């Protein structure tokens, strides 16, 4: 019956050899090779065939003969078939001695090819079934059941076959027809598919194993390792699950292989033993230790050795890939003690370390980037100053200059950038020194003014600390930044138009003086040359303050008018907060609501930004503005003390405007 099935289904065997090969879990266990035809012929009979393998050997030879002839034709027939046939032939030659030994006929070569392709497919089939996840348990039980688990093996094989349905459907359908020629053709196709599939699957399986590591970490039950190599997983599962029982079975399995191979020559022993353990190792190992796997297969405790070998080899291979060999090996040992599936679970843990290196690299990269960013922030690069502001702390947060302060020496440039709206940036480096001096002067004057002598002293100390210890740690810098924020606040206050000052009539004349002075100022705030009237009229307090920086100018605004200075400070303090807040929004100075005195109207509360743009008109109409105060000095109280801005605007007509401003100043003073 087997013979007839073998011959009748001989083509089916050869073509279905893929199925039989996949089914070869049992056949592989039987390994006699005679069961190939029987196994391929019937999945159900697969187990029986495993039992009948000895009797099936001769028929298998005949079957292979027919298949080989047909396959030969196939090989010569088509280019692709010939290529695959050549591959098969070459493989057959490589295993040819084994084939001859087994079938004792040259036709056996075809059988060997079929068996090889079947075996090679087996791992894939096992991989498929194992990859199925559900299939994995099935392969495990069949393995545990040994030949007796043929039904389970058949189911697992069926799964694997269904997985390969794309390549095998044609051959299977032809096999189902049972036509020897068609079957052989299908067999050739299938063989071609098997060979190509094996080649592709082999590499693919390696990839699978590589992915299996990750998949193992993700799905310990997935057992991609088993898919990696059915034989390796088979051995691992068998040995590991019930190692005591499995070891005997594996030796027995080896025994059948050895007898099957040895009858004609000892070559078969290395071939089957190597083929199962070594192939499992090679497939699992991904060519990590092919020779070692063979040696393991040959070991007396051999299969146990081989089983751990494949697992270990696989692990070693994966480890070599990931570079975490020791970690994976340990999990494998534990898993071996536990179960065949356990290795997958431990491997995930071991697999994680490999991913960790990449994560570590990423982290390192990020840390490098972060360090670069922090370095940039330390260097005070543009936006990063803002980041430093955040770093500096809440104290710095409220004031843009605060961030600038945390930026150490960059604090002043930062302040300049934010406060001046870019205007003060003309001399950021110089600003630091000038700021220090001006701060001292301003603070000292503030103290003299008496409204906030304590505050001035505190701010002086704060400014001093900030200046003295710009390189202190970040915490100190934050504290200092807070202090600086207050000092900067004052600076801004000085520079910001203070409404209380305008309320004071003397201030208006001062404004006029300022307007005259701006004419003399060629630069923004840098003009150190006071206006002609400035020196004469309000040189008392102006002289002490350097005109270089806007803070000095602001001081002019605050203290230039001796009459308004005493009252100026009180209002100044109040406005200090408001003005500093308004300064905090340098982007939109126009938002500051300041009673703006335009030439057309005496008093006008306008939200027009107090900027040179609007004040530009003032220089030409300064006389009007000045005379307006003469008409009613109280209205002048509403004039914003944003003379600094006006000065900048009036830079255009320095001489003429200065003269006009001087005349206006004199008239205003007279008034």
Curated annotation (Swiss-Prot):
Pfam families: AMER (PF09422). The modification Phosphoserine is found at residues 162, 229, 233, 355, 358. The keyword RNA-binding does not apply. Residues 7-21, 126-137 have a biased composition (Gly residues). It is a peripheral membrane protein. GO terms for biological process: ectoderm development; negative regulation of canonical Wnt signaling pathway; regulation of canonical Wnt signaling pathway; Wnt signaling pathway. Residues 171-182, 236-260, 276-286, 295-307, 472-487, 498-514 have a biased composition (Basic and acidic residues). The keyword 4Fe-4S does not apply. GO terms for molecular function: beta-catenin binding; phosphatidylinositol-4,5-bisphosphate binding. Its main location: membrane. Keywords: Cell membrane, Lipid-binding, Membrane, Phosphoprotein, Wnt signaling pathway. Residues 342-353, 447-458 have a biased composition (Low complexity). It is found in: Cell membrane. Residues 1-24, 76-358, 391-414, 444-598 are annotated as: Disordered. It comes from the Eukaryota. GO terms for cellular component: plasma membrane. Belongs to the Amer family. Interacts with APC. Negative regulator of the canonical Wnt signaling pathway involved in neuroectodermal patterning. Acts by specifically binding phosphatidylinositol 4,5-bisphosphate (PtdIns(4,5)P2), translocating to the cell membrane and interacting with key regulators of the canonical Wnt signaling pathway, such as components of the beta-catenin destruction complex. This is APC membrane recruitment protein 2. It comes from Homo sapiens.
